[in-house]
């Protein structure tokens, strides 16, 4: 299957999707191939030089594992192209809160899954340790995290992330999956446990309120709900990533 990051040019300054599509249309499928066969493309001299320089730099930065280089240059909607290259340094992230506004509400829980282990960080217990854990990774995967999870975390800890961030909501919508995370899970044939089936975001707020009033079982249910959220993010991208690539290449035709 085509490696989308190694076939990306749109992150190079002043190179747009039209030029990228032209390169793909010529059958060039990776940066090394471009360096060998760029002469088959009819390009203005300045643009050719810009592409050659950008491709050489991209090869070097990818070889050194510099995720920040791509996080800063890839459009937000296309960060998913980096998924495979930074898969081993990925954290799947989901938060629970008391409401929708980072300024007026609080994070109650942060769930982080690295593909092997899930860690849960809870307000009043260990919430501040989540920032150290997130610092171990180069790539974050969320659902609606660009508008919700990351702004909340950045406000909570007064930080700015430099990770590659794949907000699955956008590439999923492009391949036909719209609506909330739970609706998309159903569309993909995924099921929740009996304890968490049917729980909504509003229910999660209520569970936290019950916990604050002394109900420890409510906290356990909230942890399980949050854990299923982050674990399912990995399942979703594994199931849909090939279709994201297929759709991207189809769009250029």
Q: How would you label these PLM feature ranges?
A:
Residues 1-87:
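N-terminal accessory regions of nucleic-acid-interacting proteins
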Residues 21, 150-151, 234:
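Alpha-helical elements of the RecA-like P-loop NTPase motor core of helicases
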Residues 27, 157, 240:
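Active-site catalytic pocket residues across diverse enzymes, especially alpha/beta-hydrolases
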Residues 71-139:
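Conserved RNase H-like, two-metal-ion catalytic cores of nucleic-acid enzymes
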Residues 94-96, 149, 167, 229:
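Acidic active-site catalytic centers that drive phospho-/nucleotidyl reactions
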Residues 109-194:
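Conserved DEDDh/DEDDy metal-dependent 3′-5′ exonuclease domain
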Residues 189-253:
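Acidic, Mg2+-coordinating catalytic module of metal-dependent nucleases/exonucleases
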């Amino acid at each position: 299957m085509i490696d989308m990051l190694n076939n990306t040019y749109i992150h190079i300054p002043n190179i747009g999707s039209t030029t990228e599509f032209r390169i793909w249309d010529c059958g060039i499928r990776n940066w090394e191939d471009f360096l060998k066969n760029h002469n088959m493309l009819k390009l203005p001299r300045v643009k050719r030089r810009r592409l050659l320089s950008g491709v050489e730099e991209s090869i070097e930065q990818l070889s050194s594992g510099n995720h920040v280089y791509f996080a800063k240059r890839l459009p937000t909607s296309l960060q998913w192209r980096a998924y495979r290259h930074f898969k081993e340094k990925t954290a799947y992230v989901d938060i629970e809160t008391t409401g929708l506004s980072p300024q007026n509400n609080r994070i109650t829980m942060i769930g982080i899954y690295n593909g092997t282990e899930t860690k849960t960080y809870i307000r009043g217990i260990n919430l501040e340790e989540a920032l150290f854990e997130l610092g171990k990774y180069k790539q974050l995967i969320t659902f609606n995290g660009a508008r919700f999870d990351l702004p909340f975390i950045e406000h909570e800890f007064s930080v700015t992330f430099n990770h590659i961030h794949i907000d699955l909501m956008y590439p999923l919508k492009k391949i036909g999956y719209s609506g909330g995370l739970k609706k998309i899970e159903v569309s993909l044939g995924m099921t929740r446990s009996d304890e968490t089936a049917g729980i909504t975001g509003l229910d999660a707020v209520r569970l936290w309120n019950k916990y604050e009033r002394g109900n420890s079982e409510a906290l356990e249910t909230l942890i399980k709900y949050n854990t299923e959220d982050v674990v399912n993010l990995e399942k979703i991208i594994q199931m849909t990533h090939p279709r994201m690539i297929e759709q991207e290449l189809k769009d250029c035709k």
